[in-house]
Amino acid sequence: MTITDLVLILFIAALLAFAIYDQFIMPRRNGPTLLAIPLLRRGRIDSVIFVGLIVILIYNNVTNHGALITTWLLSALALMGFYIFWIRIPKIIFKQKGFFFANVWIEYSRIKAMNLSEDGVLVMQLEQRRLLIRVRNIDDLEKIYKLLVSGNAANLLI
């Protein structure tokens, strides 16, 4: 096993750990989920480039009669990339005291202002940065509004 194979195993393990955390662990952290809203995906061109480069590496490894384990590891990395970028659905998960956005926990008390843009992007101003929340279905913005003004997140609006 070469150092390249070890690096590939490390990347595969990191992507697998992220996928498990995103799908199974994060929704169970910080209490019960009050609302989970699917978000729009970001540009897919990065994922096409990533998977395309992996396919080129697989082709190069096969034509140069490289190690079979390297080919399998590159294939596994391509499949993990395909899952992360194309199958997995990004979402915002609202809990009792805050929400997960881009896999980061944000408490409601950190929100300084909220605005809705004309194109349906919810903008939340935090202490030092802005969150641009692009929901997949525009009707989900009403669900978010109802959750934030209900008793579940009333401390945010006081």
UniProtKB/Swiss-Prot annotation:
Any single Pfam family the record assigns to this protein: DUF986
Coiled-coil parts of chain: none
Residue intervals annotated with topology Cytoplasmic: 27-44, 88-158
InterPro entries found in the cross-reference section: DUF986 (IPR009328)
TM region positions: 6-26, 45-65, 67-87
Keywords linked to the UniProt accession: Cell inner membrane, Cell membrane, Membrane, Transmembrane, Transmembrane helix
Major localization class: membrane
Keyword Transmembrane helix: yes
Signal peptide stretch: none
Subcellular location: Cell inner membrane
GO CC aspect terms: plasma membrane
Membrane topology listed for this record: Multi-pass membrane protein
Residue spans, topological domain Periplasmic: 1-5, 66
Domain of life: Bacteria
Family classification: Belongs to the UPF0266 family.
NCBIfam families assigned to the protein according to its UniProt record, in alphabetical order: PRK02913.1 (NF002791)
Name of protein: UPF0266 membrane protein YobD
